[in-house]
Design a protein with these regions (language model features):
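Structural motif
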Residues: 109-110, 213
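Catalytic metal-binding/acid-base residues of hydrolase active sites
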Residues: 10, 28-29, 66-68, 106, ...
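Core catalytic region of metal-dependent phosphoesterases/phosphodiesterases
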Residues: 6-109, 168-170
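Active-site-proximal loop/helix segment associated with metal-binding centers of metalloenzymes
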Residues: 32-36, 74-89, 112-161
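Conserved beta-sheet core of the metallophosphoesterase superfamily
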Residues: 59-63, 158-220
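Short aromatic-enriched loop/helix-cap "lid" or pocket-rim segments at secondary-structure transitions
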Residues: 16-18, 72-76, 126-128, 188-190, ...
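Active-site-proximal beta-strand elements of phosphoester/diester hydrolases
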Residues: 1-10, 23-25, 111-121, 151-156, ...
Length: 220
């Protein structure tokens, strides 16, 4: 199975190589609409869906990030017009079942297991989505403790900047995709991949190279 991975799109919707699965590790929505629920819903339902329709892959797996504020509002049940499940179903229908959202969930596709979790350490500047409010106050509460063994782990947070995530995911994945810190470090020998397509200045990288792996049958 050929798998590509990107993160930190912030509304930039790149071309990708032909593959079986595209994984998106958070911060998908455009910056100018991220705090407007109506405009965010429209962006997901029209702009994102139209892009997905043209992608040369069979499945798109999305894990939200801290800028995907509308998704967290749905997760928290704060939107009176639509639930998270209804939103997921809508995007699935509009993309002919091509898109799957994962929030602390395990998903299996063609024998390969994917687990996604969006949580990050608190930023302490403005209010952002999926901030782990227990991060600094209770070492025994952790949103990452339910990470299971899986083939592909997708997190928005970078484990090299979050000791809880690093501890909880160690040895549980074959490949780990993440972003959040646009120019953050990753270690190829650990099968870690920083998938951000933007620089710290929110500019698309020159000569962008999409993270791509080939998962062979004997790797499963």
């Amino acid at each position: 199975m050929k798998i590509c991975a990107i993160s930190d799109l912030h509304g930039h919707l790149p071309n990708i190589p032909e593959c079986d699965v595209l994984c998106i590790a958070g911060d998908v929505v455009e910056l100018v609409v991220q705090r407007d629920s109506d405009e965010s819903d429209k962006w997901w339902s029209v702009t994102f869906v139209n892009w997905v329709d043209k992608l040369p892959c069979k499945k798109v797996i999305v894990v939200p990030g801290n800028h995907d504020i509308y998704i967290e509002r749905l997760y928290d049940g704060l939107d009176k017009d639509i639930t998270l499940q209804q939103f997921k179903d809508k995007i699935s229908i509009l993309t002919d079942d091509k898109v799957v959202f994962l929030i602390d969930e395990l998903y299996e596709y063609e024998g390969v297991t994917f687990y996604g979790t969006p949580w990050i350490a608190p930023i302490h500047w403005q209010k952002w989505a999926f901030e782990d409010t227990n991060h600094e106050y209770d070492e025994y509460k952790c949103p990452y403790e339910n990470i299971p063994e899986c083939d592909i782990l997708i997190t928005h947070e970078n484990p090299n900047y979050n000791e809880k995530l690093e501890h909880c995911c160690f040895g549980k994945y074959k490949h780990h995709f993440f972003g959040h810190w646009h120019n953050g470090i990753s270690y190829g020998h650990l099968n870690q991949y920083n998938c951000s397509i933007l620089t710290d200045s929110y500019i698309e990288r020159e000569r962008l190279k999409i993270v791509t792996i080939n998962l062979e049958e004997h790797d499963n």
